[in-house]
Structure formats: structure tokens, C-alpha cells
């Protein structure tokens, strides 16, 4: 797999390495997002060792730890995978040997899947705490703990009740790629097809690596999602089984959200559950970064709705899960062409809104946005004048106070996103200007179009942005 992005994370890891002091870096993020690949890339140019915690017993994990410590401390000859030396008798002995070695040597030690190690040897975090406190002022060890269990890493490693609380010197929450980064994984695809690949994978690095050069987009989608042996044909369901108890309930909830239910009571009705019971399931899905609870930009949270954050889950629950029988009977190609492909533009609507928000963020970094937004998101609500419901795809907002004696002035960048096969007309701009009126601010208007525009505008407040422009920043 080609190494893409992660420049900020790599630069920060290098700063930590060059400090020559004790460092404890916590790296976490959802499965398949590229954490391990990042750490291997970083370790390739430095001395150190890497181990993976096993979903196994304490003795197996102690063996893995012992071998990694021998490797880190130069006790395994170059080219040999394992030492003939006996395992350390305890985890304390293994880690103490590592810390002692680090008094005179700069060394990196990475424990991947740390939650598995901690589950098999529950005392490991406390033992690390004691060793860190004893050695931190003299040690040159750069210790990296990595994990995919979001709740474990946030609560039992970073949380204030963790023995390791306050010991970390940096933390890295590894997120899926933006659409611009995802493009580097599929350079053989057109811009439009790259956008669809981003939507189908949620920007997850490993999934993007499955798109083979030489295959058309249709061929890739069919082979990944709509064949019995496809690599993504049961991926969301499989991940839920790894992460959660009662996967059947979570499947039902995600299916309901993917098909349009967004408010607590709507979802509860669809899955035949009380709203109180539902809240616990929703919280777990939020912790896993599969769904998110959002509210209109600048508004109170009592208008909040739930939406699937990972667009691959939306695609899977909307198109793959309902057709699993046909896929198992080798009719997935027919399913794709008859039922899925005609609906791809509809599926891409929210994905394109996500891309537009990421484009605005990229422009902010370039310094080419009229003002610095304090919030970016969606807006929906009621027009007090017409009493009609209003939705705006993209709103970037800031209340700017230029004079300490004056009231802040609201600045708005409002956007409309159209993933359609025809150019946008001027009526879309007029509609956006009318709807933006309800937000009461000094507004700029950005239109995002899959297929360009049927008009030009000389209004300095207006930008017309097509897909190639979004990729050619």
C-alpha cells in the first residue's frame, strides 16, 4: 500500500523522537484507518521494536513482549525473527529491562493493539505507570501505545481514572482520509470516480487500497461489495461483531438511520425500542465514530439529529444488507446495475456535502476564505417570516467584533451542493440567497457542482466551484 498523507503526525513523531527525552505517545483510531501503517513507516528510519498485543492469554502476550524487548535492546541478531533466550518471568521484568537499556540508548518501542495486552495482563498500565515515574527523568525511551478500541483508549489510557493519566506527552487520533488525501490512493480514477470511491470507503485507507488499477469503478464496486467473496461484502457487520455485544440491535439501528430515520423517536419506532434504551446503543455507536449527533450550526442542541458519520456504513446498510440473499446467489452484478448504480447520485449527495466542508477547511489553511469561521456544518430550521422549513447544505459562521464598543457582526459562508449530471442554473444561487436570509448575517455564497454551471457571476460574494476545482487546490 502506498504511504499517503499523515504529514502532520509524522512531523510530530519526529519532533518527539529528536527530543532525546522520555516520550509516551498514544495513537488511536478506528480499525483499518492506517495506524499500523503509519507506525511502521515511522519506525523504518529509526532503531526500535514493534509488537502486537494478542487476543490471547497472558503467557502468549508475555512471550511477544519478551521477544520485542530483546529486539529493541539488540539481543536478537539482525535477520533473526526470534531469540533463543527464555521469556522474561514477568511483565515487570521485561519492561524494567527495556527502561534500563533506554538510560544509555535512544530507542522506540511500539505496542500495537494495546487493549488486547491490557485485557490479558490487567496490571500492565499500573506497571507502566510505576516505571515511567521512576525512569522518566533519565530515560531516552520513546514508548508508543496504539489501539483500535476507541472507548478503551479514550477511557482506560487517556481517561483521568487511568493509571497512565498525565503521563502521555502526545496523543494522535488518526482519522480517515479527506477526499483530497483519498485521491492519492486511487490516482487511476477520474475526479468524479475518486469522489465516489471516497464515499464508498468513508476515506478509510485500507478500503481505498482495494481499488485495483485497471478495474473500472463499476468493476471495483461489484467485486468489493456485490460478490460473495468481496472484501467489503460483510465488513460493517463483521466490525460490529468485533466491537459490540448484541450486534443484531446495532444492525437494526444503523439500517434505520441509513434509510432516513434521524431523530431519537423515529429511530426508536423503527427498531421497536424505547428511547431510553436506544440512547445507550446510540452512545456506543458515537464512541466508535460510526454515527454522530449533530445540530444546526449556531443553534441549540435540542434540534439535534443522528446521522451516519462513516459513509461506507450508509452505503452498506442501504444497498448491500437488503440484497445479501441475491449476492450469495451470485446475482450481485444484476443488483448493482438495476438497483444501486441508478441511486449512486442520491447516495453521493451527503458525501458531496462532506467534501465541500473539507474543501472549505483546505481553503482556510490556504488563507483564501473571506473570514476565519468559528463553526462549520449544516443548518436547518424554520423561516420565521414564511413559517416554512429551510435547509442549507453548508454554513461556515463567525461572529466578529471589530470594535469593542460595538456588537459582533455575524459573517456567513453558505453553500449549496449539487451532485447531478447537469450544470447548475442561476435559480439555485437565487434560492440559496433567499434561504440564507434567515441566518441574518453578511453572507458569501459558494456553489458546488458535479457538472459545472450554466451561468457566470461577477458578484464578489459568489464562488462557483466544480469537482476539478475541488481537487486542484
Question: Where do the PLM segments sit?
Answer:
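Phosphate-binding site recognition
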Residues: 1-333, 337
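A cross-kingdom feature that marks ATP-driven nucleic-acid transaction machinery
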Residues: 297, 306-473
Amino acid at each position: 500500500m502506498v504511504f499517503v498523507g499523515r504529514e502532520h503526525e509524522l512531523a510530530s513523531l519526529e519532533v518527539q523522537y529528536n527530543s532525546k527525552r522520555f516520550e509516551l505517545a498514544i495513537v488511536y483510531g478506528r480499525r483499518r484507518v492506517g495506524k499500523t501503517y503509519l507506525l511502521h513507516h515511522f519506525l523504518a528510519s529509526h532503531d526500535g521494536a514493534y509488537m502486537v498485543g494478542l487476543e490471547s492469554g497472558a503467557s502468549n502476550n508475555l512471550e511477544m513482549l519478551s521477544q520485542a524487548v530483546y529486539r529493541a535492546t539488540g539481543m536478537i541478531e539482525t535477520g533473526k525473527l526470534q531469540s533463543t533466550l527464555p521469556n522474561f518471568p514477568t511483565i515487570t521484568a521485561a519492561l524494567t529491562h527495556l527502561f534500563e537499556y533506554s538510560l544509555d540508548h535512544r530507542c522506540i518501542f511500539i505496542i500495537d493493539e494495546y487493549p488486547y495486552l491490557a485485557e490479558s495482563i490487567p496490571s500492565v498500565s499500573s506497571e507502566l505507570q510505576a516505571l515511567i515515574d521512576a525512569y522518566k527523568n533519565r530515560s531516552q525511551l520513546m514508548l508508543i501505545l496504539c489501539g483500535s478500541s476507541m472507548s478503551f483508549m479514550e477511557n482506560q489510557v487517556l481517561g483521568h481514572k487511568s493509571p497512565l493519566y498525565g503521563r502521555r506527552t502526545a496523543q494522535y487520533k488518526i482519522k480517515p482520509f479527506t477526499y483530497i488525501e483519498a485521491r492519492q490512493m486511487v490516482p487511476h480514477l477520474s475526479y468524479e470516480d475518486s469522489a465516489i470511491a471516497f464515499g464508498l470507503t468513508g476515506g478509510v485507507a485500507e478500503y481505498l487500497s482495494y481499488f485495483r488499477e485497471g478495474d473500472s469503478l463499476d468493476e471495483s464496486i461489484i467485486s468489493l461489495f456485490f460478490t460473495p467473496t468481496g472484501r467489503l461484502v460483510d465488513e460493517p457487520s463483521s466490525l460490529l461483531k468485533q466491537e459490540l455485544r448484541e450486534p443484531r440491535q446495532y444492525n437494526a439501528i444503523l439500517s434505520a438511520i441509513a434509510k432516513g430515520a434521524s431523530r431519537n423517536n423515529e429511530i426508536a419506532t423503527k427498531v421497536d425500542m424505547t428511547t431510553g434504551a436506544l440512547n445507550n446503543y446510540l452512545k456506543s455507536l458515537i464512541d466508535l465514530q460510526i454515527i454522530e449527533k449533530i445540530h444546526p450550526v449556531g443553534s441549540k442542541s435540542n434540534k439535534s439529529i443522528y446521522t451516519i458519520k462513516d459513509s461506507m456504513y450508509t452505503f452498506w446498510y442501504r444497498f448491500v444488507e437488503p440484497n445479501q440473499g441475491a449476492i450469495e446467489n451470485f446475482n450481485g452484478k444484476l443488483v448493482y446495475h438495476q438497483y444501486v448504480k441508478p441511486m449512486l447520485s442520491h447516495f453521493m449527495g451527503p458525501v458531496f456535502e462532506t467534501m465541500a466542508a473539507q474543501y472549505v477547511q483546505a481553503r482556510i489553511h490556504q488563507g483564501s476564505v473571506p473570514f476565519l469561521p468559528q463553526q462549520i456544518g449544516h443548518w436547518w430550521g424554520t423561516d420565521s417570516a414564511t413559517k416554512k422549513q429551510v435547509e442549507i447544505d453548508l454554513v461556515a459562521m463567525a461572529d466578529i467584533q471589530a470594535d469593542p464598543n460595538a456588537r459582533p457582526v455575524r459573517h456567513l459562508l453558505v453553500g449549496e451542493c449539487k451532485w447531478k449530471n447537469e450544470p447548475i442554473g442561476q435559480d439555485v444561487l437565487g434560492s440559496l440567497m433567499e434561504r440564507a436570509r434567515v441566518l441574518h448575517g453578511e453572507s458569501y455564497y459558494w456553489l458546488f457542482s458535479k457538472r459545472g454551471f450554466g451561468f457566470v457571476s461577477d458578484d464578489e460574494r459568489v464562488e462557483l466551484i466544480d469537482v476539478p476545482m475541488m481537487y486542484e487546490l
